[in-house]
Design a protein with these regions (language model features):
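Divalent metal-dependent hydrolysis catalytic cores, especially in the metallo-beta-lactamase
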Residues: 83-136, 151-165, 187-202, 221-226
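Active-site core of metal-dependent hydrolases
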Residues: 181-296, 304-305
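Divalent metal-coordination and catalytic microenvironments
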Residues: 8, 21, 26, 53, ...
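Histidine-rich, glycine-flanked metal-binding segment
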Residues: 2, 10-57
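His/Asp/Glu-enriched, well-ordered alpha-helical/loop segment
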Residues: 277-357, 361-364
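Metal-associated gating/positioning segment near the N- to mid-region
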Residues: 43-46, 51-114
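Active-site gating loops and adjacent loop-to-helix segments of metal-dependent hydrolytic enzymes
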Residues: 71, 75-78, 82-98, 147-168, ...
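C-terminal cap of metal-dependent C-N hydrolases
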Residues: 8-10, 28, 353-383
Length: 383
C-alpha cells in the first residue's frame, strides 16, 4: 500500500514548505522538495494525492477522551455514549488517550482496556490511563506499577480528581504515592508514566501538584493537569505552574462563546496567547476535548437547558481560533494537538510529519477545514 502526496505545504508542525510525501504501508518513508519524487517505476502503483493549495499536518492527538462514555453524575439516564473510531477520525483525531472519570464503577478498567484494544484493531491508535477520579486507584491488576509495566495500552494514571467536591479528597501523602507509583511504572516500562489530573473549582487549585513538585524528588514532567481554563483563578495559577516547567492541558469546547460568557471559562485561544505572552514554553501546552463527557447546559438565568456531550471536533475549532482570532502562528497552534501531547506522553512515532514516523496525517484547506484524514497509512475520512 503506497500513497504519494505531491506539492503540499507541510506543517510538521514546524513549517517545511511545499514537499512531496511518500507513504508505504503505515509509515512516512520519504519527504522531499515538491517535484522531487516522481511517480515512475514501482511508485507508478502508488495512490496519487494532489496537494496543490492544501496543507499537511500530523494527525491530531486527543489526550483526554472518555472513550467508554462519561456522565452519570445526575443518575443513570445521564450516561453518555461510547466514542467510535468514525466519530474521532472525522474530526482529524488519529490517536486517542482514553480515561475514566467520575464513574469508576459502572465503567471499569477491564472495559476501558478492551475498548482501547478495539480502537487499535479498527485502524487508529489508542492508549489509556489506569484509574478514575478516585484514590485509592481502581487498577486492572493489583497495582499502578504493574498496570503500566505489563499492559501495553496503559501509559499512566488518570484522571485523578483534586480540588473538586467529586474527588476522594486525597491527602498529600496519598496523592504523592499515586504520582510516585505512576512514575516508577513508567521508568520500568519505558513509558511516560504520566498522571492526568482533573482540576475542579476549589480555590486550592494546583496545591497538591505544586507540593509534589516542591517537596519530593518527582519532576513536574510526571503530571499533566487538565481543565486549567475552567476559571480565571485556576488559569492564573496554571500560568505560574507552567512558567516553572509544568505541562498544562486546556479543555476545548464546541460552543466556545457559551462556555466563555455563561460559565466564565477562559477562552482557549486567549489563554494560549496569555501564556505565550507571559513566557511559557509553547511545547508545554496541549488541548484536549474531554470527549464523550457530559456537559450540563444552563441559560444566563441559571435555567437548565439540557445535557450536551463533549466532542473531539473542538480540537480543530480551537486551533482555528488561535490562528484566525488571536493570530498565533499555525506551527504553535497545531503543536498543541500533535507534537506536544506526543512528546509529553512519549507516544513513539506520533505527532510529527517526519521520515520514519507513523503515517497519521491530516490534509486541510487554506481555511483549516479538513479535506482528508490518514491513519496508519489508510484514508479514514474524506470531505
Amino acid at each position: 500500500m503506497m500513497k504519494l502526496i505531491q506539492n503540499i505545504d507541510v506543517y510538521a508542525p514546524q513549517h517545511l514548505g511545499k514537499k512531496d510525501v511518500l507513504i508505504i504501508n503505515d509509515k512516512i518513508v520519504k519527504i522531499k522538495d515538491a517535484g522531487s519524487i516522481c511517480a515512475d517505476g514501482f511508485l507508478s502503483e502508488a495512490e496519487m494525492i494532489n496537494g496543490e493549495g492544501l496543507l499537511l499536518t500530523p494527525g491530531f492527538i486527543d489526550c483526554h477522551v472518555h472513550v467508554l462514555g462519561g456522565g452519570g453524575e445526575g443518575g443513570f439516564a445521564n450516561r453518555t455514549p461510547e466514542a467510535t473510531m468514525e466519530g474521532l477520525t472525522k474530526f482529524g483525531v488519529t490517536t486517542v488517550v482514553g480515561c475514566l472519570g467520575t464513574d469508576g464503577i459502572g465503567r471499569d478498567m477491564c472495559a476501558l482496556v478492551a475498548k482501547t484494544k478495539g480502537l487499535n484493531e479498527q485502524g487508529m491508535s489508542a492508549y489509556c490511563y489506569t484509574g478514575s477520579y478516585q484514590i485509592p486507584v481502581h487498577t486492572l491488576t493489583d497495582s499502578i506499577v504493574k498496570d503500566i509495566m505489563m499492559i501495553q495500552e496503559i501509559i499512566g494514571t488518570g484522571e485523578i480528581a483534586i480540588s473538586d467536591h467529586r474527588s476522594s479528597q486525597p491527602t498529600f501523602e496519598e496523592f504523592a504515592r499515586v504520582v510516585a507509583d505512576t512514575r516508577l511504572g513508567g521508568v520500568l516500562s519505558g513509558k511516560a508514566g504520566i498522571v492526568n489530573v482533573h482540576l475542579g473549582d476549589s480555590p486550592r487549585c494546583l496545591d497538591l501538584i505544586e507540593r509534589v513538585v516542591d517537596e519530593t524528588e518527582i519532576p513536574a514532567s510526571q503530571i499533566l493537569p487538565t481543565h486549567i481554563n475552567r476559571n480565571e483563578m485556576l488559569f492564573g495559577k496554571s500560568i505560574e505552574y507552567a512558567l516553572k516547567g509544568g505541562a498544562v492541558d486546556f479543555t476545548g469546547n464546541e460552543d466556545i462563546d457559551y462556555w466563555e460568557t455563561i460559565c466564565d471559562e477562559v477562552r482557549v485561544c486567549n489563554g494560549i496567547k496569555r501564556m505565550l505572552d507571559a513566557g511559557v514554553n509553547p511545547d508545554r501546552m496541549t488541548i484536549s476535548s474531554d470527549g464523550q463527557g457530559s456537559l450540563p447546559m444552563y441559560s444566563s438565568d441559571g435555567e437548565f437547558l439540557g445535557m450536551g456531550v463533549g466532542q473531539s471536533s473542538c480540537l480543530l475549532k480551537e486551533v482555528k481560533e488561535c490562528v484566525f482570532k488571536t493570530e498565533i502562528h499555525l506551527e504553535i497552534a497545531i503543536s498543541t494537538i500533535t507534537s506536544n501531547p506526543a512528546d509529553i506522553l512519549r507516544l513513539k512515532g506520533k505527532g510529527k510529519v517526519e521520515e520514519g514516523y507513523d503515517a497519521d496525517l491530516c490534509i486541510l484547506d487554506q481555511e483549516l477545514q479538513l479535506v482528508e484524514v490518514i491513519a496508519k497509512g489508510n484514508t479514514v475520512y474524506t470531505k
